[in-house]
UniProtKB/Swiss-Prot annotation:
This is Proteasome subunit alpha type-6-B. Keywords: Cytoplasm, Nucleus, Proteasome. One of its GO terms (cellular component) is proteasome core complex, alpha-subunit complex. The keyword Translocase does not apply. It is found in: Cytoplasm; Nucleus. Component of the 20S core complex of the 26S proteasome. The 26S proteasome is composed of a core protease (CP), known as the 20S proteasome, capped at one or both ends by the 19S regulatory particle (RP/PA700). The 20S proteasome core is composed of 28 subunits that are arranged in four stacked rings, resulting in a barrel-shaped structure. The two end rings are each formed by seven alpha subunits, and the two central rings are each formed by seven beta subunits. The catalytic chamber with the active sites is on the inside of the barrel. Belongs to the peptidase T1A family. The proteasome is a multicatalytic proteinase complex which is characterized by its ability to cleave peptides with Arg, Phe, Tyr, Leu, and Glu adjacent to the leaving group at neutral or slightly basic pH. The proteasome has an ATP-dependent proteolytic activity. InterPro entries: Ntn_hydrolases_N, Proteasome_alpha, Proteasome_alpha-type, Proteasome_asu_N, Proteasome_sua/b, Proteasome_subunit_alpha6. The keyword Nucleus applies. GO terms for molecular function: structural constituent of ribosome. The gene is PAA2. Its main location: cytoplasm. It comes from Arabidopsis thaliana (Mouse-ear cress).
Length: 246
């Protein structure tokens, strides 16, 4: 692969190319897309929903052991898009950090603090020669006692932002375009509308109708702030509602 004046600058993570690029960080973003899945996050007025594809790479695998949705605490969920091994490593460290936070301060770690910690960690990985960036984009969701529903996205470069709706993975840009139209009027989605907007966004950009076993859906609600993954029957109900609406 020819990069002209960029050649040779992809061997060391800490060296900028003459154009001001860090190739290894750019490759980490490509690794996220190369995983071949697309994820969506949508924030409603009293809930947050994240949806991703559930692809089982091998017919002999136990389907229940394949997941991109992780509880960090009882109240915080994380949807990881990208390399599975990197995701699990990040989640394990995040759980340790959240437990340490609760022990030290006496209350649960808020979603924005967790997102900042993940972003800080990712940013440090872009500075040291003996590390590599994580090939993961993490969406963090939770209900804040003061600020209500929160949805954050953290990327391999160390950015983290709060979102009304967002996407990651293979069809990220197409999903963002779809969500921008849906969120144009700044709608105050109910819980059902939030879940169905996220699922229909995924169906629209991938141009396929999913079965309940082909996607994962994670939610938090203001009236029940515990993070949980929806059961297959619950996903089926939302898929039916979407097909009837369309």
């Amino acid at each position: 692969m020819s990069r002209g004046s960029g050649a040779g600058y992809d061997r060391h993570i800490t060296i900028f190319s003459p154009e001001g690029r860090l190739f290894q960080v750019e490759y980490a973003f490509k690794a996220v897309k190369a995983a071949g899945i697309t994820s969506i996050g949508v924030r409603g007025k009293d809930s947050v929903c994240v949806v991703t594809q559930k692809k089982v790479p091998d017919k002999l695998l136990d389907q229940s052991s394949v997941s991109h949705l992780f509880p960090v605490t009882k109240y915080l969920g994380l949807l990881a898009t990208g390399m599975t091994a990197d995701s699990r490593s990040l989640v394990q460290q995040a759980r340790n950090e959240a437990a340490e936070f609760r022990f030290q301060y006496g209350y649960e770690m808020p979603a924005d603090i967790l997102a900042k910690w993940i972003a800080d960690k990712s940013q440090v990985y872009t500075q040291h020669a003996y590390m590599r960036p994580l090939g993961v984009v993490a969406m963090v969701l939770g209900i804040d006692e003061e600020r209500g529903p929160l949805l954050y996205k953290c990327d391999p470069a160390g950015h983290f932002y709060g979102h009304k709706a967002t996407s990651a993975g293979m069809k990220e840009q197409e999903a963002v375009n779809f969500l921008e139209k849906k969120m144009k009027e700044n709608p105050a989605f109910t819980y059902d509308e939030t879940v169905q907007t996220a699922i229909s966004a995924l169906q629209s950009v991938l141009q396929e109708d999913f079965k309940a076993t082909e996607i994962e859906v994670g939610v938090v609600r203001a009236d029940d702030p515990l993070f949980r993954s929806l059961r297959t029957e619950e996903i089926d109900e939302h898929l039916t509602a979407i097909s009837e609406r369309d």
